[in-house]
Curated annotation (Swiss-Prot):
EC numbers for this chain: 2.4.1.-
Cleaved signal peptide residues: none
GO molecular function: UDP-glycosyltransferase activity
InterPro entries membership: UDP_glucos_trans
Family matches, as SUPFAM superfamilies: UDP-Glycosyltransferase/glycogen phosphorylase (SSF53756)
The family this protein is said to belong to: Belongs to the UDP-glycosyltransferase family.
Positions that bind UDP-alpha-D-glucose: 269, 328-330, 345-353, 367-370
Key words of the record: Glycosyltransferase, Transferase
Record-annotated disulphide pairs: none
Record gene name: UGT76E3
Source superkingdom: Eukaryota
Protein's name according to its UniProt entry: UDP-glycosyltransferase 76E3
The keyword Glycosyltransferase is annotated on this UniProt entry: yes
First-level EC class: transferase
């Protein structure tokens, strides 16, 4: 009997956004340590900077057309349309070169054209979600809605506040639709994202202890294995990928601050802040009388390069009381003993990193999944304070004092430390995420 040849090459297809690219690379590193080799097809739109080091990764180029800016939904839809044919040609060429030695394709859930190509070429394929299981369940709920009826229903206050079935405390008005322009194109995107096609399983960068009910519901709805492998950034396989230049001078400044006194402010790699909001944030932080480390990314303030948009006297006080950088070594900062809280946009990567370092959060979400994460941080895990609506300095000051000075903040810190230990236990031998990774590897070897 002919011995079965074990396929060891895996094709990874990340979405070309930092918050999606980084965990996909961390997943790839985990699989490299399990004996697989990783191939990453990339076009001009998502080419990795050549200065970055990804040992064990093979990057290959696929031709693509120039994307037009049509907003987040339009750009994603366009990307999936224009990339399918060239990706298919790329995979066919790979199959010829590698002698069919391709174990599977693992693709970001928003790069769903890969699922169609894998189906046509009869290749095993797995969906990777860099967001929460709760977000994926919400996409399933949204995919079944009729846009016109939903908009009419949502005019009723009772409907807005109705809890989504088996999703307490999420209400229908909490479903992530508000920031994506017209509703129907967004619902159509949800339908494409939740269409599992021939996928063998779904891989999620989350942890069972954080989302057990959402994971159970997702498993029931999809009827294929769901592997929660998170937090990927703290597995032994993770190497702390970053594609932005970090300013480590802030660590020296942190060394001079009192324990748990500093508020770390970072709104991720994509959020755009208005000048007025920045001014209110600055005054609120100054009035709180707490030191702060503030990441102001170039281009993150509308019509300005950053702190220059503040009045001169305010800018001077900010530089005296706080420390400003363009980008920070976030995991190292969150793990520093002087950091007592994280003012965050509540992106999922930042949320996991904060919990792993035992740092409670002030939640200022801007769009989509961030809103869901903020609700869970405040109402389910009870380790966050949400600041909503139009930002004003008084709300900033109150939130900082609640977290750093009041007993409420101390209780949040205790709960965060409990979750920290649970998340770290999940990746150790016998932990839920460690077991899920082993099961995934076993699954990959049987495809």
């Amino acid at each position: 009997m002919e011995k079965r040849v074990e396929k060891r090459r895996i094709v990874l297809v990340p979405l070309p956004l930092l918050g999606h690219f980084t965990p996909m690379m961390q997943l790839g590193q985990a699989l490299i340590l399990k004996g697989f080799s990783i191939i990453v097809p990339q076009g001009e739109f998502n080419r990795v900077n050549s200065s970055q080091k990804f040992p064990g990764f093979q990057f290959i180029t696929i031709p693509d057309s120039e994307l037009e800016a049509n907003g987040p939904v339009g750009s994603l839809t366009q990307l999936n349309k224009i990339m399918e044919a060239s990706f298919k040609d790329c995979i066919r060429q790979l199959l010829k070169q590698q002698g069919n030695d391709i174990a599977c394709i693992i693709y970001d859930e928003f790069m769903y054209f890969c699922g169609a190509v894998a189906e046509e070429l009869k290749l095993p394929n797995f969906i990777f979600s860099t967001q929460t299981a709760t977000h994926k369940v919400c996409c399933n709920v949204l995919s079944k809605l009729n846009a016109k009826k939903y908009l009419i229903d949502m005019e009723e206050h009772d409907v807005q506040n109705k809890v989504v079935e088996n999703m307490h405390p999420l209400r229908y008005k909490d479903l992530p639709t508000a920031t994506f322009g017209e509703l129907e194109p967004f619902l159509e995107l949800c339908r494409d994202v939740v269409n599992k096609r021939t996928a063998s399983a779904v891989i999620i960068n989350t942890v069972t202890c954080l989302e057990s009910s959402s994971l159970t519901r997702l498993q029931q709805e999809l009827q294929i294995p769901v592997y929660p492998l998170g937090p990927l950034h703290i597995t032994d396989s993770s190497t702390g990928f970053t594609v932005l230049q970090e300013d480590r001078s802030c660590v020296e400044w942190l060394n001079k601050q009192k324990p748990r006194s500093v508020i770390y402010i970072s709104l991720g790699s994509m959020v755009l802040m208005e000048t007025k909001e920045m001014l209110e944030m600055a005054w609120g932080m100054l009035n709180s009388n707490q030191p702060f480390l503030w990441v102001i990314r170039p281009g993150s303030v509308s019509g300005s390069e950053g702190i220059e948009s503040l009045p001169e006297e305010v800018s001077k006080m900010v530089l005296e009381k706080g420390y400003i950088v363009k980008w920070a070594p976030q995991i190292e900062v969150l793990g520093h003993p002087s950091v007592g809280g994280f003012w965050s946009h509540c992106g999922w990567n930042s949320t996991l990193e904060s919990i792993v370092e035992g740092v409670p959060m002030i939640c200022r979400p801007y769009q989509g999944e961030q809103m869901l994460n903020a609700i869970y941080l405040e109402s389910v895990w009870r380790i966050g304070i949400q600041v909503g609506g139009e930002l004003e300095r008084g709300a900033v000051e109150r939130a900082v004092k609640r977290l750093i000075v009041d007993k409420e903040g101390a209780s949040m810190r205790e709960r965060t430390l409990v979750l920290k230990e649970k998340l770290k236990a999940s990746i150790r031998g016998g932990g839920s995420s460690c077991n899920a990774l082993d099961e995934l590897v076993k699954h990959l070897k049987t495809e």
